[in-house]
Amino acid sequence: MLLIFLGAAALARPAALQARVVVDETGRRVNVPDHPQRLVSLAPSITETLYALGLGDRLVGDTDYCDYPPQAKLKPHVGNVLNPSLEKIVALKPDLVLGIAEANRRQTADQLQRLGIPLYGLTDHTLDDTLRSIADLGRALDCNVAATALEQNLRRRVAEVERRVAGEARPKVLFVVWHQPLTTAGPHTFISDVIHRAGGVSISDDLKSEWPGLTLEAALDRDPDVILFPSHVELSPPLDEIKRLPGWREFRAVKQNRLYVVSESIIHPSPRLIDALEQVAAILHPEAFAMAASDEWRVASDEQQAPGFSSRREGFACSSLATRHLSLTATLTGLPPQQIEAAQ
Amino acid sequence: MRVAATRRNVLALVVILSAVCALVGLAALTIGGVHLTLGEVWAVLRGTSSNPEATAIVSEIRWPRVALAALVGASLAVAGTVLQALLRNPLADPYVLGVSSGAALGDILALWVGGRVAAAAPGLAFAGALLTTAWVYALGRRGGRLKSFTLLLAGVVTASFLSAIILFVLTLLSARDVRGAAFWLMGDLSAATGVELRLLAPAVIASIAVLYWFSKDLNVMLLGEDEAAHLGVNVARVETVVFLLSSLLTGLAVSASGAIGYLGLLVPHLGRMLVGSDHRTLLPTAALGGAIVLVLSDTLARTVVAPSELPVGAVTAVAGAPVFIYLLRRTAG
């Protein structure tokens, strides 16, 4: 009898005894332990946020694409964002898994639920969502103080950018998620929000989907003042090459040489999104940032490095681009070439 | 090779293939992203494992997936076998004839409508499969006779038409649903759940049993409709049963795992090489063979590019498309 009791006690996890039910950002009810100690992150942005909150040592697993900060690369990986390995997640014995509705698949959430592993889901459509997610994570992960400090610091930087660009003329911006076929960011994305907050206006804000395709003609017709590319070698060829492409060379922005590569942190809804905001604002309104001591706003950054123009590559694949690629692949698989070949 | 369809032979065949299927299944349960030894897997299967993680991995993640692969494999292979008999065409296959695309369209429409309709997705997939089968069959008949190539072309064109509609519906879905749907369209067994299996297993087994009951009639149908009618086969009834049940099997398979191609072509062909074309031996061979081939394909899909995964449809297409071309050349010759 005693043995059975001891066995049962050994099996029950202490954290599970003190769980509380919270509603996550996606509206799911989640059993979150009071002091989660073993976290698995299913998206690079969440990994970045966890490190920014000083929770890196509680992270026991992340995705293949989690490359920032560099320590994140050393954590055990559970696979890619769209199709993480459930068995690896189980083997890491997490007491809380963190995912993001815009990057992970619903099936993953359902499967984790079935396995009895709590998943806290975030949503990120705007820059404010990203800031709110930091506060939410702070509450869920029992680190309110760090989260509040981080959130306030980021809000201060956002306010500073907004103060500087207030009243300036708003340049029209084309954000190139993918150049061939031209794919851009729709209105309900944090990219569009960053462009807006940085004192610009996205030329694709009237389109419905999140990552809409845009014909080159339509883009030319909308005549952007500035064209932005995220720094990601695989997806955006060198600017020199783009400038020479037929069609592309007709852009006024190309003729005036207003093409810029921005930090790929713009596609991560993490604290580094504010780095991207500052960078985009400085591109769109150089005068507003040149007059003050140019270092001032950079110093405000938490990061050691300035929000640089450094070209890092891997991170992009994790975002919705992978999705885009997937639907393109599905297009191809809809009718396998073998069928046509065979029919002839 | 030809195996006489005595009761003893059929029984022996079923026992041997079931044993192979069990071995392949055990191997599939042992292979995965997390390293588990055969001993650990065996302990979980016997219920004597004291490792909660191993238990969760084997019984909650790997087992549903292996079981789903076996059921889907059996469904598609049997659907292919009976369609080939009925249409007297070795190239008939739910995927090539567009039946899978019809099922996929039905399923994805249900997803688009959402709510209670989404729960009825397998039903809509069945309806889509049935409508496509009837449509392609009608197109393939000219002056009361089935034209082999007209039928195939009708199937291929229908498949591409339906794929276009699917792409259109995909653009209407929310970004989140598109991600799931795009994965599923390529053939995805990873969403296997215990609940689905409990619904799927009886339906698949019952359908295959009913089709087996018609296996003698299917043999006679190979001679041609008129000949079969002369020999006392109720042709209309056989046609109805085959169309309904092959559509049901395809609809269920597609709804559970997306459009996995060429299995209905590859497996019956292998089966005929192994036991001959008597449906009393061919049908059980195709059912168990389909299960074996898809479990193997899915294990390959999970391991060749580990830690990532290939869509299982890619693996079956790589193996199946060359067989299709080989059969096409032989038929055309």
Tell me the role of every PLM-derived stretch.
Chain A
Residues 86-93, 115, 214-223:
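Short helices/loops that flank or line small-molecule/ion binding pockets
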Residues 12-16, 293-328:
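Short, basic, low-complexity termini and linkers enriched in Ser/Thr/Gly/Pro
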Residues 22, 28-29, 96, 106-183, ...:
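Extracytoplasmic substrate-binding proteins
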Residues 103-114, 226-244:
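A ligand-binding cleft/hinge motif common to bilobed small-molecule-binding domains
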